[in-house]
Amino acid sequence: MTTGSALYIPPYKADDQDVVVELNNRFGAEAFTAQPTRTGMPVLWVARAKLVEVLTFLRNLPKPYVMLYDLHGVDERLRTKRQGLPSGADFTVFYHLMSLERNSDVMIKVALSESDLSLPTVTSIWPNANWYEREVWDMYGIDFKGHPHLSRIMMPPTWEGHPLRKDFPARATEFDPFSLNLAKQQLEEEAARFRPEDWGMKRSGANEDYMFLNLGPNHPSAHGAFRIILQLDGEEIVDCVPDIGYHHRGAEKMAERQSWHSFIPYTDRIDYLGGVMNNLPYVLSVEKLAGIKVPEKVDVIRIMMAEFFRITSHLLFLGTYIQDVGAMTPVFFTFTDRQKAYTVIEAITGFRLHPAWYRIGGVAHDLPRGWEKLVKDFVEWLPKRLDEYTKAALQNSILKGRTIGVAQYNTKEALEWGVTGAGLRSTGCDFDLRKARPYSGYENFEFEVPLAANGDAYDRCMVRVEEMRQSVKIIDQCLRNMPEGPYKADHPLTTPPPKERTLQHIETLITHFLQVSWGPVMPANESFQMIEATKGINSYYLTSDGGTMSYRTRIRTPSFAHLQQIPSVIKGSMVADLIAYLGSIDFVMADVDR
């Protein structure tokens, strides 16, 4: 199920300076200040007055930066290691742009004074800037002039303050005890009421009144605590407003009070179906800060376990997706089949859903005795099982009728909205980070990138089914070619250090005690790592101030971008089509809300 892509993806160019030359030629070198980082891309500071002009230039280049991959902020006021920061930078807003035709990224930063926290919106350049700008305002109080609807997105409408500011409390014990009297309850209920006029919607058309329907936040087809308000003309969706934030737990704030080591279990709970796949971009980014090169065996173990979790996540997607369009039986089979994968995962890591098993510099422990047979049995069994699903369910005429041609979009639209993963590849765009920008040794494995052509709900499902087959191929190669060697790097910042040395050397024992109890001290710098996760591209952008905890942890998840795209895709469709579309996205709200 592979097809040719009209878009050629060249070899990855880390820290590509070509765009810097183009920017200097157009605006002059004095317009930019380069910041050296370990992010693997050019990082350029620009004045606020030039921001929109620079971003428009990058969007319209012959090989354009078509995707606004990420947009967020940093409160710089308590940062002590300020090399590379402009003077007076109390707050930073960064724009991470991606070009597929160049296969390279660039980051544009703007420094803001605490007394003047405003920027022009860039929603006219990239439509997906809408939610990102809302979140920056919600978390930092930075105003975006000209934004179509600048309002809370993660926090409740009645919330006071901006949680990611450094002067905002980080623990519940720093707040007054929670209480809910009748007056406050009524206030919260009224604040949650949807008012069409606030969103530029009419209550009636030329010949009829519209109905406004709350789908969620606890509807089974919403796949979590997610509300989407539908403006309906009969069964037809005239417009809709997704409402997120019900599952927000402040993961990025938590990272500021956990050590580099102790934050690993928190990553498991971002995409809570992704298991160790969540650990991978985080530990890779920390290892960039630390300058750690892990042994080959660590890379292969990490890849093998990440692909196991890709399979378990996709199996759950498959069962619930088929259930969403009306077939009840397959979900029971997919859950039973996931158990076979979890038997292997539990034998290797000791846990099932949330192993928190990767470590800075390696993995928690070596592979156990007998792991080979468990893995071998699984890779021999699953492909035949996928054949059964394809015959029994995916070729079913009812499922095809509910999903083929439904919620369809093309590559251009996908890139404009920041869509990645199977949602992008279902449009025919051959962009998979494991091939396009290999990490952890993926370049040493033979596998294909499943593609489709129509970009509809059916194709998104079929791409994921084929991805499971490719994951089995990768796991099989790990089984056959597992290297010998240590499961941790020999590096001072490997956390915890190799256990056997702590029993022989007092210095290593002291290091073990300090790194586990206090935390390893990472060099002051910024690092970044993206991976091809279960639901699309997931990344961690880390800022170290030379301490035992992260100064700023930015977690970019694929599902946030995917839900923002919903209104542009589903207008004019039926409510039943929306249910099929939501299922085909494959999201969990923890991945959206963090």
Curated annotation (Swiss-Prot):
Enzyme Commission number(s): 7.1.1.-
This protein's record includes keyword NAD: yes
Keywords (A to Z) from UniProt: Cell inner membrane, Cell membrane, Membrane, Multifunctional enzyme, NAD, Quinone, Translocase, Transport, Ubiquinone
Gene3D superfamilies: Cytochrome-c3 Hydrogenase, chain B, NADH:ubiquinone oxidoreductase, 30kDa subunit
Molecular function in Gene Ontology: NAD binding; NADH dehydrogenase (ubiquinone) activity; NADH:ubiquinone reductase (non-electrogenic) activity; quinone binding
Pfam families linked: Complex1_30kDa, Complex1_49kDa
Main location: membrane
InterPro entries given in the database record: NADH_DH_suC (IPR010218), NADH_DH_suCD (IPR023062), NADH_Q_OxRdtase_suD (IPR001135), NADH_quin_OxRdtase_su_C/D-like (IPR037232), NADH_UbQ_OxRdtase_30kDa_su (IPR001268), NADH_UbQ_OxRdtase_49kDa_CS (IPR014029), NDH1_su_D/H (IPR022885), NiFe-Hase_large (IPR029014)
NADH dehydrogenase I subunit D: annotated span: 209-594
Similarity-based family: In the N-terminal section; belongs to the complex I 30 kDa subunit family. In the C-terminal section; belongs to the complex I 49 kDa subunit family.
Binding partners and assembly: NDH-1 is composed of 13 different subunits. Subunits NuoB, CD, E, F, and G constitute the peripheral sector of the complex.
Protein name: NADH-quinone oxidoreductase subunit C/D
